[in-house]
Structures are given as C-alpha cells and as structure tokens.
Amino acid sequence: MSSWDNLLEGKVALVTGGSRGLGRADALALADAGADVVIADIMVESDQTPTRTEQESMLAQMMKAQGVVYTEQTVEDIRKMGRRSMAIKMDVTDRQGVFDGVARAAKEMGRIDILVNNAGTVDHVARFEKQSIELWERDLRVNLTGSFNCAQAVWGGMKERGWGRIVNLASVAGIMGGFGQASYSTTKIGVIGLTRTLALEGARYNITSNAVVPGIIGSEAFKMADALNKEMNDRMRKRTAFGREGEPEDIANAIVFLCSDKARYITGVALNVSGGIELFTF
C-alpha cells in the first residue's frame, strides 16, 4: 500500500460496513494516511456483539469458509500501523443504534471527523414487475436511510468543531440504471442527491460531502460471483474502457483524497471511479 504521507494525521474516521471488501480497503487506506479508524459493522465477532440473528450467523459461517477477513482482523491490522482502532456493532437501519454507536465511538476516540458511508446491500436481482415491496423497502432502508442516519449522527459534532468530511458510496447503477436492479439503482441515485444536499448545508461549517461512484470492483463478492457466473462478469469487464475490473484500493484512494485538505474546495461531487464503464454505448 502506497503512503499518503499522513494526509489525515490526527483525524478520526468512522467506516460503516468496514470489516471486509470495499469497507476494509477504505479503513486500511485511511489508517495508512494517518487517521484513527472506527469500524462500524453489523458483523462484529467479539464480546461487543452479545446477540446475532440466525441469518447473520449463517452468513458469518459462509463468509468465514471463503476466507473473508472479519472486523477484528481489520482492527488489528490498523493497530499494527500505529493507529488507534475499535469495532462497534452497527445496523445502519436502526436509527437509535446508529446514534448510540456514534456517541460511544466519539467518547472513546475523542470525536468523529470523517464518515465513510460504505454499508449497503445488493444481493438480489429481479425484474421490476417481479420486484417485491419487501426487498424494495429493505434496499431503501439500508442503502439510503442508513446513510441518512449515519450522517445525521455525526453532523452535530462536525458542525460544532467546524470541520468534517462525509463520503457516501454510490454506484454507476444509480447513474446508468441496472437491469433487474430497480431498488438498488434508485437508492444509489438517491445517495447522490443526499450527498449534494449535505454539501450545500455543510459548507458554511467547513463540512464537505462527496460521493464516490464505483463501477465493477474486484471485491470479495465480485470474485465469488466470478466462480458462479464468469461469463456474465466477463461481459461487464468488456464494458469498461480498460477491459477489466478495478480494485478496492482504487475506491479507497479516491476516498482518502476527498477526506484530505487537498480536496478542501471540493464538495457535492459524484466522483466516478468506474474504469469508464458509463461511457459504453453499444
């Protein structure tokens, strides 16, 4: 991992969904840039997690079998860099739980300067006419309301201190649409709208708000999908200008930049980190 020369020295970041995939890459990159990092995730394996649903337990076992790194390992890796880190269990759809978790993290770490809204869900594909209202509402709660909850929870502290950075994870599906992804695409364009509103309202308090817009990224989930349907993934690769997927570090590097003072005059931007997939016309 390349050094960012302590661009974020002295800052405290909170990354939702930070235990694996893009969230883990984001957390490690922020730490590499000098930040202390709080990992907020629904899948936390420790005495901080007194209960777990049957579904969560099944998912944990499945992902563990695939060699997925968990929250505690990410926290340990950050501490090895000489940064402070802690893990908190957080369901971003649980509004009170989000506020309680942020308050606890701020108390233990001193404050929250940076929020990366990475937590999200995209685990089903259904044509619009077959889309269930239950899955539609779940995607809205996780991807859009979850980002809203977390941003509100950190907003007061950022406003009081006169400095803050919010980065929301959107998707090219929000810009281009996605076949069989009515709910997911809708939530991701909604995230961009939320991002721009926060930018307008936050500027007077020196709070910037930006979105990073990934295309196809070689995350753990993408690699698992490769094993199931490589032909489909190859078609997606060919739609990018580079003919390949990006890496989680490509997203993480963009986030570090947007959180740094080098991007202090950038706000309300939806930054495509997509390999040019949105340029594909035929």
Locations of regions flagged by a protein language model:
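Residue(s) in the substrate-gating loop at a strand-loop-helix junction
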Residues: 171
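Active-site helix of classical SDR
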Residues: 151, 187, 195
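Short-chain dehydrogenase/reductase
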Residues: 1-109, 123-126, 134-135
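A conserved structural motif in NAD(P)-dependent oxidoreductases
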Residues: 240-251, 262
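Short C-terminal tail/terminal secondary-structure segment
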Residues: 2-4, 125, 176, 256, ...
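Substrate-binding pocket helix/loop in short-chain dehydrogenase/reductase
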Residues: 126-128, 132-140, 236
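Alpha-helical segment proximal to the catalytic Tyr-Lys
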Residues: 156, 200-204, 264
